[in-house]
């Protein structure tokens, strides 16, 4: 990838880490721009207009174009590399795991991590407290499924 790539991020975010890791594995330099999500820096009119109308990070900036969502950013960075399978079934299977991660891992494990690390147990709403056990259960199920799958691989 020869284009200048800017990563708009909250560096403590797991989704932002995925983008940095993908770029690092491929030796692709990233210019990094940090935002404090706890201070609402991704909800400002300027950010919403110029970076991502959805108010979320990570976002990669390529020239004057922006790609939000971590897996879309990872895919863009890795496209054409050894990280993206060229065989059709393997390619679809890779996408399956990327979609699965966002549906099963992120809403459970990543949400719990955010609540525990940045919000704090004492500051959780009653609704969040009620979700702790179900999210832990679903998160553990996701981790077991990944472990079982990986134990069958090299």
Segments (PLM) and residue ranges:
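GST-like domain detector, emphasizing the conserved glutathione-binding G-site
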Residues: 1-131
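Amphipathic alpha-helical packing segments from all-alpha helical-bundle domains
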Residues: 131-150
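Cytochrome P450 catalytic-domain "roof"
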Residues: 57, 148-154
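Secondary-structure boundary/capping motif
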Residues: 16, 91, 142-145, 154
